[in-house]
């Protein structure tokens, strides 16, 4: 009887636990290891709007219980942490690969462009004419991806103290 009780308790605890965040993706350009590497420590910000609605960038993209990728998130603020061991170039495509989500001129994170729709991109409040996946991630960059119409004009991201 004690074994049955222990199993029931374990099942209840497991079902109430938070679900794990996304696991690191197969991005060949983004190393992952057992701890953070801070040779290069920068941050970019990503906002995603799908038909005028904000789509949250999840916490713990690129982080598992055993490893952390050089591109990752700690929370749902949209801040992408670039914590790397060298000065290699990382793109938004690299971050989306770690996240295991689609990014192109026809799709953002599983949402595809429909008839009469398009993807608009701004970097630091300036229109970006290239493919969104080619955006090079840089310190304090403010990246906005919008699939619409319903395109919104956003204020620049205000960085929290310490970033």
Language-model regions, residue ranges each:
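Ubiquitin-like/PB1-type beta-grasp interaction modules and other compact soluble beta-rich domains
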Residues: 17-163
